[in-house]
């Protein structure tokens, strides 16, 4: 069975909490998941090993990608995402002008490289709570189904 690559960047733990919930949903659907923090990926060629990719990020400053994702996104220029099912999630703060702008940047990069975004991106204010937790678990379940990785 094909595995799903789950990659995320976190600073305060909010995006990691989101990744935990998404992974829970994926596992409930019996999908196999390989999970990495963006800063631990030395080579974007890792993406070529997967047909299904979920990426999550927090937003830094005025809607920017965090440093942990900059090199990875730059290296994605060399990767063909055609035929890959993808989804994006992230945390942010509405106090800033561009709420979760880094999520939009990642989604645009995946589309530019030919990836198929199969679910609307999930954007959460700070740490997921209450109904947001169930939304993220469902996001994982839905991605597993849309990618054909659910059992």
UniProtKB/Swiss-Prot annotation:
Belongs to the flavodoxin family. Gene3D superfamilies: 3.40.50.360. The gene is ykuP. Keywords: Electron transport, Flavoprotein, FMN, Transport. The keyword Flavoprotein applies. InterPro entries: Flav_short, Flavdoxin-like, Flavodoxin, Flavodoxin/NO_synth, Flavodoxin_CS, Flavoprotein-like_sf. The keyword Electron transport applies. GO terms for molecular function: electron transfer activity; FMN binding; oxidoreductase activity, acting on NAD(P)H. Its cofactor is FMN. Low-potential electron donor to a number of redox enzymes. FMN binds at residues 10-14, 88-119. It comes from the Bacteria. This is Probable flavodoxin 2. PROSITE patterns: FLAVODOXIN (PS00201), FLAVODOXIN_LIKE (PS50902). Residues 4-144 form the Flavodoxin-like domain. Pfam families: Flavodoxin_1 (PF00258).
